[in-house]
Amino acid sequence: MLILVSPAKTLDFDNPPGCESYSMPTLLDQSKQLIEVCRTLTPTDIATLMKVSDKIAGLNVARFSSWQKDFTPENAKQAVFAFRGDVYTGLDADTLSEASLQKAQKQLRILSGLYGLLKPLDLMQAYRLEMGTRLANDRGTNLYQFWGDIITDEINKTTEEQGDEFIINLASNEYFKAVKPKQLNAQVITPIFKDCKNGQYKVISFFAKKARGMMVRYILDNHVDSLEALIKFDTAGYYYSEKDSTVNEPVFLREAQ
């Protein structure tokens, strides 16, 4: 199975990575085209486009300006160690064993507005470019049009090479919209995580994001390779609810925290 997750806005380029091994992103030529578009934007443009403060806009102007395609461990960092945020808190990549890291390199892919699709150990330079950004480019008015079939084709190439029957979609709607499910050659499974609040089970964003990361960790550490094994996920008190689930959307519930 191949797992898809979203990136994170929060980045860590200060602390050393959890391992020395690294790989290179497959779609860097595409990234370079986007960087060239982003370099035409002023801080005011970025603040408006990304709905961020002037300080963050200025930071991103500097990031786009200093971005260079020749990645090395000195000027870039492996994606799974660079991203911070709720999903990555749940995954806790810094404590993955070498075996689980290598499994992640094969099984996990990170969707990205700038890089398209990243393997966990792919080097990346700091950026902020969310997939939903309406960045006009040569291919259209937004990043979905820019990426077109490219990300989907890359996923299909990977699943064909590895013989993956299932794609476990643990990405947000914003990012999974960059994938064209009808063109995929594997069955898409989208786990749903609900927490009990005021007597009702609801998707609570903070908890759901963290749960996605915990499920990635569960898959890697427990060598999960079937849906039967996947629904045994029980980290942090979650449990599979058969009556609330469908074939493609297994639902996991948790009592009030």
From Swiss-Prot:
This is UPF0246 protein Shal_1126. HAMAP family: UPF0246. PANTHER family: PEROXIDE STRESS RESISTANCE PROTEIN YAAA, PEROXIDE STRESS RESPONSE PROTEIN YAAA. One of its GO terms (cellular component) is cytosol. Belongs to the UPF0246 family. GO terms for biological process: response to hydroperoxide. NCBIfam families: PRK02101.1-1 (NF002541), PRK02101.1-3 (NF002542). It comes from the Bacteria. It holds the Pfam family H2O2_YaaD.
